[in-house]
Structures are given as structure tokens and as C-alpha cells.
């Protein structure tokens, strides 16, 4: 993105990876650069311009594809691994902004995806509050703010949280889970 403003900024790179229930990546994924509309780069602030210059993304924009081509590639890949509409959640770090741009620029893809979101950043925030040792040992990121690298790092981070934050297999018995649930149930008044 040329920034985080859904009204004024442009989507300039899209990457998609589908995983199975064990967070293993299925297929090759999608990683495309989108040619921005005329004038889209002029409003980019210095921080974003420097980030995209350092990552090499700005150099690639002239060879980018259209939003329609990007949407077609994303849909084809997701449908290959999750053919039923509304079943594939959007996942990653701070994906609320991503979803806003996807809904604006890739509406057919947005409609195909589930309304549900798996935001790895939420787990990070919970770890910071409840398990600081987990938070302070989160895997380092080296993706340089490129879409595909960011997704791969989000998957690895989610695997880390699964290993260190969640109850180990087989988890509680059904009776134990019901008993715990009862402790937190709010009864109607």
C-alpha cells in the first residue's frame, strides 16, 4: 500500500498463502505487484517511500499488473485449496487494514473469503499482557515489508504462539472444557 488511508492510498502489492489446519502452506501462493494509478505515488509519505525503496517494491511498480488480474490470481489460488465460498478466513498481522483495501479493490475476492479474521497481532497483544516471556521471545521478522515475506512471517509467528501459548494436545477432556465454560458463562437476568 502507498499508505494506510483506504480513501486516498493505493494497493500496490498482494500476496496470498493458504495453509492447512497445521499451518502448512498449500501450493505456491500468489505474489504480485500492482501497477498504481497515476499520481498514487505522489502522496506517499517519506516513511512509506523509504520502506518501499529499501524493499525494492518501488522499482517493480512499472511492471505491475492490474487490480483485476491480481484479483483473478488470488481467487484462482484460494478456490484451488478452499473451493467453498465464505470458508477461508483472512489471516495475518493487523489484517483489518488489509481487509479494508481488499474490500475496496478486490471485491469479488473479499466476497469469497470468510467474514472471519485470524489476527496474529491480537495474540501478540495478549501475550504481551499475560505472558511477557512469550512476547519478548517472539520470532524476529526479516521480511522487509514485502507482502509474501510478511505472510510467511505471520504464519511462523502463529506457529510459535500455538506452541507456547495454547494448551498442548490432547487438551482438556469434554467434561473439563464444560466445567471451565460454566465458570465464565453469563446467565441472563
Which residue ranges define each predicted feature?
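Active-site-proximal helix-loop-helix substrate-binding element of RNase H-like nuclease domains
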Residues: 36-39, 46-48, 120-155
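Short, well-ordered beta-to-alpha junction loops that form the rim of enzyme active sites
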Residues: 91-96
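Conserved non-catalytic scaffold segment of RNase H-like nuclease domains
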Residues: 1-90, 139, 185-189
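Short conserved catalytic/interaction loops centered on acidic-Pro-aromatic/His motifs
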Residues: 110-114, 134-138, 167-173
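Conserved beta-strand scaffold positions in the cores of enzyme catalytic domains, especially
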Residues: 90, 117-120
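Acidic active-site catalytic centers that drive phospho-/nucleotidyl reactions
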Residues: 13, 20, 98, 119, ...
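Acidic two-metal-ion nuclease catalytic site recognized across multiple nuclease folds
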Residues: 141, 145-189
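Substrate-recognition/cap helix-loop segment adjacent to the acidic, metal-dependent catalytic center
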Residues: 80-82, 97-116
Amino acid at each position: 500500500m502507498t499508505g494506510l488511508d483506504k480513501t486516498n492510498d493505493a494497493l500496490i502489492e498482494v500476496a496470498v498463502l493458504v495453509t492447512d489446519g497445521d499451518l502448512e502452506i498449500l501450493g505456491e501462493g500468489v505474489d504480485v505487484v500492482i501497477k498504481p494509478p497515476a499520481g498514487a505515488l505522489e502522496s506517499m509519505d517519506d516513511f512509506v517511500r523509504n520502506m518501499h525503496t529499501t524493499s525494492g517494491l518501488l522499482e517493480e511498480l512499472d511492471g505491475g499488473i492490474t487490480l483485476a488480474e491480481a484479483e483473478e490470481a488470488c481467487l484462482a489460488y484460494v478456490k484451488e485449496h478452499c473451493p467453498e465460498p465464505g470458508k477461508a478466513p483472512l489471516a495475518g498481522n493487523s489484517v483489518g487494514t488489509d481487509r479494508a483495501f481488499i474490500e475496496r479493490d478486490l471485491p469479488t475476492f473479499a466476497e469469497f473469503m470468510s467474514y472471519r479474521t485470524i489476527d496474529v497481532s491480537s495474540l501478540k497483544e495478549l501475550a504481551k499482557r499475560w505472558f511477557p516471556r512469550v512476547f519478548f521471545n517472539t520470532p524476529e521478522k526479516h521480511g522487509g515489508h514485502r507482502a509474501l515475506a510478511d505472510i510467511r512471517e505471520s504464519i511462523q509467528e502463529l506457529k510459535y504462539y500455538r506452541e507456547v501459548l495454547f494448551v498442548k494436545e490432547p487438551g482438556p477432556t469434554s467434561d473439563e472444557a464444560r466445567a471451565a465454560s460454566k465458570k465464565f458463562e453469563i446467565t441472563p437476568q
